[in-house]
UniProtKB/Swiss-Prot annotation:
It catalyses: sulfate + ATP + H(+) = adenosine 5'-phosphosulfate + diphosphate. SUPFAM superfamilies: Nucleotidylyl transferase, PUA domain-like. GO terms for biological process: hydrogen sulfide biosynthetic process; sulfate assimilation. GO terms for molecular function: ATP binding; sulfate adenylyltransferase (ATP) activity. It is an enzyme of class 2 (transferase). The keyword Nucleotidyltransferase applies. This is Sulfate adenylyltransferase. Pathway: Sulfur metabolism; hydrogen sulfide biosynthesis; sulfite from sulfate: step 1/3. It comes from the Archaea. The keyword Ion transport does not apply.
């Protein structure tokens, strides 16, 4: 049964076309602030219901509850603060209770009702969210670059930005209809920012054996250098689905969402977001949303013990490897053979092979997938 959205109601903060014309006229009278591309993506996730029950950027009470308790002030699970940072001089003429226009590259995208202006401790944010204050962590580095004050308040979205992959993006209101049309009662979601290798395929198919449908949901948004480009990920998955999945058991759609690399906290966040899209189950990977050695391999599994009231079932499927003796993809639970027979698939090693223009061996990646990736002149983010 498709779950109710987080908090019970799917948020929609998109202004109707009738109201939009009047509000756009009003925006010229309002103070405005320029926001970053990452905050524009947050705006879209709030307005389109991906971040339900949030209706805007967090006020201080919710921010502090999430920071220290991993719950909103109403006790609903929520693990990553969704905040709008500004410099004091940008809001010198703004007070609590005012409406402001939010712009990106001088185009107005939303109106925000400023409920609260408050300060924050970036180092403490990093310590709680990322479990490290090391500026070499990409999420921590981003945090330290953010501005000094935070604005909390509800938003109304006036414009959706164009994106070269917008035809790939579905929002919760669309996926919920789609899953119902397919008559899927159980849907397992798979979060990714990578092209698929045989280990991913193994995990997805293991989950699909006891659910009605698989929802492959790659992130479109800020990625770190060395990650695969969005269009490469989609093309690679299309090849995999075409050649190695039965018809009508997979939905592939993009999600505009920022990647924080916040490990365990972000694993829970990813699950909540997929619940809003209509998923009943969520695959949690080994070192999910991790980076480097900042988190223990299965720390992202353990955190779910703190959230029995999440409303989506996490699936912990062990990392797959190729066993020469078994003759296929297996994991530690089902393979009795020693390490000398096991070939582990490393994403880093795969990248190195692809960077050299070499086709990876079949036990690492399907040849049809490799062919598509290698057809791109440069598959990586710089």
């Amino acid at each position: 049964m498709i779950p109710r959205p987080h908090g019970g109601k799917l948020v929609n903060r998109i202004v109707s076309s009738k109201r939009r014309t009047a509000l756009l006229k009003e925006t010229h009278e309002l103070p405005s602030i320029e926001i970053s591309y990452e905050r524009l993506i947050d705006l879209l996730d709030i307005a389109n219901g991906a971040f339900s029950p949030l209706e805007g950027f967090m006020v201080q009470e919710d921010y502090l509850h999430v920071l220290y308790d991993m719950r909103l002030s109403n006790d609903l699970p929520w693990t990553i603060p969704v905040i709008l940072d500004v410099d004091p001089e940008e809001i010198s003429n703004v007070k609590e209770g005012d409406d402001i226009a939010l712009k990106y590259k001088d185009e107005i995208y939303a109106i925000m009702r400023v409920e609260e202006i408050y300060g924050w401790d970036k180092k403490e944010y990093a310590r709680q969210v990322y479990k490290t204050t090391d500026p070499n962590h990409p999420g921590v580095a981003k945090t330290y670059q953010r501005k000094e004050l935070l604005l909390g308040g509800t938003i109304d979205l006036l414009n959706q930005p164009h994106h070269p992959l917008e035809h790939r993006i579905l929002w919760p209101i669309e996926t919920r209809v789609l899953f119902r049309e397919k008559k899927w009662r159980t849907i397992v979601a798979f979060q990714t920012r990578n092209v698929p290798h045989r280990g991913h395929e193994y995990v997805q198919k293991a989950a699909l054996t006891f659910t009605d449908g698989l929802f492959i949901h790659p992130l479109i948004g800020w990625k770190k250098p060395g990650d695969y480009r969005d269009e490469v990920i989609f093309a690679a998955y299309e090849a995999l689905i075409k050649h190695y999945y039965p018809d009508n058991v997979v939905v592939l759609a993009g999600l505009m969402m920022n990647m924080n690399y916040a490990g365990p906290r972000e694993a829970v966040h990813h699950a909540i977001v997929r619940k809003n899209f209509g998923a009943t189950h969520f695959i949690v990977g080994r070192d999910h949303a991790g980076v480097g050695d900042y988190y223990k391999p299965y720390e992202a599994w353990e955190i779910f013990d703190e959230f029995p009231d999440l409303g989506i079932t996490p699936l912990f499927i062990r990392e797959a490897f190729y066993c020469k003796k078994c003759g296929g993809m297996v994991n530690e639970k089902i393979c009795p053979h020693g390490e000398e027979y096991r070939i582990r698939i490393s994403g880093t090693k795969l990248r190195e092979i692809i960077k050299k223009g070499i086709t990876p061996p079949e036990y690492m990646m399907r040849p049809e997938v490799a062919k598509v990736i290698l057809s791109f002149k440069d598959p990586f983010v710089h």
